[in-house]
């Protein structure tokens, strides 16, 4: 009996030993970035290595010429290791990294170092000469149906009848309509995020919008592949179109591997409530309680504490550390390893895909100082590149506080640090962010459309007053203006007022701003968010198989759609290369008699935007505008081709807009 007992114990010990060895077997399943580029101004490269037991390797070595292992960082999770390399003297090629455990065989990983396509200074971003066209890939056009259902992804379905589920648009659908953008006259395309969002549908909602990233180095396969994305950008460039990539540093998606296996305890903000013992938590929409009793921390969505010089700690914490929604964990940019990962990711997409700009989502929700470091590094590497930050507060003073105009001659260094001496609760110093979004313009214009322009504050007076604060901006010409986007009601709401829409667009495209359009405005798409955001993100007519209505072609548009398309297209093509708009001075006149006038001037050439801000006929009394008209007798309305005699008063129909072009005669 003792003999059998001994054998049984021996077998059990052997099984236990083998199981332990199996559990600790070293493996490398992923390295981020997937590859890298030599010749960067910053020679440091962070590799995030993921694999079973990888944290506890004894050494990481390489014999690749010009590469040095500077340090390795062991995180809380046994499945992550950060390797910091110096590539200062490296050349393109395949580098082999060896990960040696304390016991057992080392694991070797081949890693590609690539040649850059061009120097960073050769990459030119968007600016005031451009018109950005914002679209949602899932809602614009479908060029393939074989990517509608991807095996292995979390449960989802395509259903075009449901405004908050996926509809099946993709990169190929956009690529097939590149000529449409040229016909319209826009010069840059901004797609809402295209990276993988592997979140399950829940409660009739999905992450079709792209703002819950689960893989920072992979295009969502329902949109296409990385190769298809790069092809789309190359073909856009061949047609003179720039491409702006939407990024999110503030948060990731709940299904990102960082959530289930957090690299370190401080990788996320307010992670305490996440635990296996949490009960009753819906990963998409629910709340929960951690095993320690900690509660889910929700952001307040109030951005003012970030600039408030009197901000309380609790308010600032809720803004910057609270989660946007339960399905979007808040990233901790104060952790330098998190920020290095994100910075490198933005650089990787610039180098790999050749994007021409970045739109950074929820910019003030992230910690200001790490974000400023990102912008400083990006501006140094790409001095002519541009990034726009979403800064959603409708007061110009708030928006202007985020803009810092860097001096390219100083390698991206800020030349006006005194403009940001304190920056409220978030600390001081420049942001290095070149472009901000003009939510004041959006807000005031959408109020004015419902009002009569009186002698004081109503109607277009709101726009006039908003522009008065341009002195707060370091560079007003690098502020992005819009009348609607994917997060707002459509400008038309549930209506079809073409005259009002033309007035808004005439203003948008002639003031001292970078203008941004939203897909479908050119064919008068409307809708409100009253029920769901999906109702302002409807499918573009003709973009999907089986559509009976095709707004991509003149023949397929209704008469009203064609009239708006033709009017806007004419204005957009006129704006291209028009230096009066891109370089000229701007002068505005207080609305008088319900009429608002803005003049753009350059070397005698003048563009006069004239808006009747009332629902009744009005008169532009030319004598009031003598300083910008002079003795000019003849002006051309560029949208209609009609000529106006500026020696006489101009009669305007209700809500009429004119864009008059002339050479000023003294």
PLM feature spans:
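Bacterial Sec-dependent N-terminal signal peptides
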Residues: 1-28
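Carbohydrate-interacting/catalytic domains
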Residues: 19-22, 100-131, 182, 523-666
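Beta-strand/beta-sandwich contexts
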Residues: 21-55, 113-116
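Immunoglobulin-like IPT/TIG beta-sandwich domains and homologous Ig-like subdomains
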Residues: 40-103
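Hydrophobic faces of well-ordered beta-strands that scaffold small-molecule active sites
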Residues: 133, 189-191, 243-245, 358, ...
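Substrate-binding/active-site clefts of carbohydrate-active enzymes
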Residues: 140-347, 352, 371-381, 391, ...
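Active-site-proximal helices and loops of the catalytic beta/alpha 8
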Residues: 251, 345-347, 351-474, 496-498, ...
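Active-site clefts of carbohydrate-active enzymes
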Residues: 476-496
């Amino acid at each position: 009996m003792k003999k059998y007992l001994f054998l049984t114990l021996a077998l059990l010990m052997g099984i236990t030993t083998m199981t332990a060895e199996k559990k600790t077997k070293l493996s490398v399943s992923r390295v981020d970035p997937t590859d890298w580029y030599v010749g960067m101004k910053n020679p440091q490269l962070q590799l995030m290595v993921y694999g079973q037991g990888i944290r506890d390797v004894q050494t990481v070595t390489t014999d690749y010429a010009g590469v040095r292992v500077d340090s390795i960082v062991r995180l809380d999770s046994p499945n992550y290791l950060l390797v910091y390399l110096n590539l200062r003297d490296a050349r393109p090629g395949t580098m082999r990294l060896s990960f040696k455990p304390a016991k057992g065989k080392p694991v070797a990983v081949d890693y590609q170092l690539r040649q850059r396509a061009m120097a960073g200074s050769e990459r030119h971003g968007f600016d005031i000469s451009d018109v950005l066209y914002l679209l949602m890939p899932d809602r614009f056009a479908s060029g393939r149906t074989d990517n509608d259902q991807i095996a292995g992804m979390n449960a989802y379905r395509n259903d075009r009848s449901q405004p908050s589920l996926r509809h099946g648009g993709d990169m190929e659908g956009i690529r097939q309509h590149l000529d449409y953008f040229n016909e319209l006259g826009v010069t840059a395309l901004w797609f809402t995020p295209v990276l993988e969002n592997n979140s399950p549908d829940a409660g009739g909602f999905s992450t079709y919008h792209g703002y819950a990233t689960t893989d920072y180095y992979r295009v969502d396969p329902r949109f296409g592949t990385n190769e298809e994305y790069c092809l789309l950008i190359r073909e856009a460039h061949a047609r003179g179109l720039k491409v702006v990539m939407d990024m999110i540093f503030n948060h990731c998606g709940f299904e990102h591997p960082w959530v289930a296996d957090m690299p370190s305890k401080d990788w996320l903000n307010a992670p305490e409530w996440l635990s296996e013992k949490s009960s009753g938590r819906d990963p998409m929409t629910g709340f929960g309680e951690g095993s320690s009793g900690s509660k889910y921390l929700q952001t307040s969505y109030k951005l003012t504490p970030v600039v408030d010089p009197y901000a309380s700690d609790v308010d600032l914490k809720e803004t910057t550390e609270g989660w946007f929604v339960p399905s979007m964990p808040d990233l901790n940019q104060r952790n330098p390893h998190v920020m290095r990962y994100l910075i490198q990711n933005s650089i990787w997409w610039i180098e790999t895909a050749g994007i021409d700009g970045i739109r950074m989502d929820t910019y003030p929700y992230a910690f200001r100082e790490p974000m400023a470091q990102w912008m400083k590094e990006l501006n140094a590497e790409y001095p002519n590149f541009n990034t726009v930050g979403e800064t959603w507060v409708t007061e110009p003073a708030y928006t202007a506080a985020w803009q810092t105009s860097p001096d390219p001659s100083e390698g991206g260094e800020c030349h006006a640090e005194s403009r940001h001496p304190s920056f409220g609760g978030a600390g001081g110093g420049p942001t290095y962010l070149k472009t901000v979004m003009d939510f004041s313009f959006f807000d005031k214009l959408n109020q004015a459309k419902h009002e009569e322009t009186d002698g004081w504050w109503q109607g277009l007076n709101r726009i006039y007053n908003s522009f008065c604060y341009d002195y707060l901006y370091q560079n007003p010409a690098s502020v992005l203006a819009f009348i609607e986007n994917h997060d707002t009601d459509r400008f038309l709401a549930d209506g079809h007022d073409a005259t009002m829409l033309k007035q808004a667009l005439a203003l948008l495209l002639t003031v001292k701003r970078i203008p941004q359009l939203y897909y479908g405005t050119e064919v008068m798409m409307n809708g409100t968010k009253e029920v769901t955001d999906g109702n302002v993100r409807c499918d573009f007519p003709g973009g999907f198989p089986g559509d009976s209505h095709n707004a991509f072609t003149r023949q397929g548009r209704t008469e009203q759609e064609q009239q708006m398309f033709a009017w806007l297209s004419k204005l957009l093509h006129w704006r291209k290369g028009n230096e009066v708009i891109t370089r000229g001075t701007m002068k505005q006149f207080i609305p008088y008699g319900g009429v608002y006038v803005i003049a753009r001037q350059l070397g005698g050439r003048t563009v006069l935007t004239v808006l009747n801000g009332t629902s009744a006929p009005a008169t532009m009394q030319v004598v009031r505008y003598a300083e910008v008209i002079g003795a000019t007798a003849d002006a051309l309305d560029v949208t209609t081709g009609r000529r106006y005699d500026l020696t006489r008063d101009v009669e305007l129909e209700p809500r009429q807009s004119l864009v008059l072009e002339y050479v000023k005669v003294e």
